[in-house]
């Protein structure tokens, strides 16, 4: 759960965090008994705890298909991300990955920590994949083939232009959006969304991750991963790694704001995609990550910390998003609130200020025209810095009760 300091600063986070804690425990108890499915769902919770929770929104058949789709693509991504694999070995694996998923004996040792376990024990994923319906299998195979080919292309090619950047993000994330739309359609729950809108859903998430993960990617050993397009960063520095040096802070922030402004172009498409969804479970599955993305962009914007360490939404706010996202009015409210926060951080002297403000105003206009903003729940109102002692005492009492309850349950489970 969130740290005590964070809870005292944001006491409104406590209840959503508590619900998230119990939801996580419930999700862990839902792991199927069959060894290959048990491996897949356990691995899902390890490689992405938040996705492991969000996927629980879906019905059983679709949940299984999305779980396997996610693990197959995480495995593919693990091969791409491992900079120690020689190009002549990596490219053929990426190109043939869509065939390997049919092979119960195939595995390839690479990656670290839980990703290495995923790759070493990949036969469990293949076994589970082969139990899916043919419609799900075909969709997963098609997207895996196209993504592997795209990744292979960019192993041998740098991201030079914004068009390159959009193309790379299409291969590694836009195709995920297309694949999920196909899975939703195959389940009979949704109409097939257009490729353009599906692509934007993936690009908005991927560009947010690329912006947030700048420092981790540039410091990757033995070789940096460089996804920011030269067409953007070359306006500010001579080399991409120069952005992390303190003497370049002013230029680095301008470059960062340029990248965020580029990502915002996809927000309106995302709102359109989500507004077309019919099923509440699929809606929540899609909406929660998109709200997290615009929230993360709001935190990153104009923030030098992106070049010094990790920038991410506090756990309590994440819990709040998961708890409160139920309808499209919640999404419009969240996008409106976070775009207001972004707008408040725009420096009029920033070279992209006019473009940034224009994109934010377009997002706000779409949210206002929905006619639902009066119903919105606030995501960004900061708590007062000081809270009275009675409130703090109540929180400590609740925490003590919760700790005692969880401890007693743990002892009972061990007996």
From Swiss-Prot:
Could you tell me which InterPro entries the record lists for this protein? Isoprenoid_synthase_dom_sf, Squ/phyt_synthse, Squal_synth-like, Squalene/phytoene_synthase_CS, Trans_IPPS_euk-type, Trans_IPPS_HH
Q: Which cofactor does it need?
A: Mg(2+); Mn(2+)
Any stretches that span the bilayer, and where are they?
281-301, 391-411
Q: What is its EC number?
A: 2.5.1.21
Q: Which UniProt keywords apply?
A: Endoplasmic reticulum, Isoprene biosynthesis, Magnesium, Membrane, Multifunctional enzyme, NADP, Transferase, Transmembrane, Transmembrane helix
- Provide the membrane topology annotation: Multi-pass membrane protein
Q: Which reaction does it catalyse?
A: 2 (2E,6E)-farnesyl diphosphate + NADH + H(+) = squalene + 2 diphosphate + NAD(+); 2 (2E,6E)-farnesyl diphosphate + NADPH + H(+) = squalene + 2 diphosphate + NADP(+)
An annotated GO cellular component of this protein is:
endoplasmic reticulum membrane
What would be an example GO MF term here?
squalene synthase [NAD(P)H] activity
Q: Which residues form the signal peptide?
A: none
Give, as in the UniProt entry, the pathway in which the protein acts: Terpene metabolism; lanosterol biosynthesis; lanosterol from farnesyl diphosphate: step 1/3
In the record, the note on similarity to other proteins reads:
Belongs to the phytoene/squalene synthase family.
In UniProt terms, what function does this protein have?
Component of the triterpene saponins (e.g. ginsenosides or panaxosides) and phytosterols biosynthetic pathways. Catalyzes the biosynthesis of squalene.
PANTHER family reported in the protein's UniProt record: FARNESYL-DIPHOSPHATE FARNESYLTRANSFERASE (PTHR11626), SQUALENE SYNTHASE (PTHR11626:SF2)
UniProt protein name:
Squalene synthase 1
According to its UniProt entry, this protein's organism is Panax ginseng
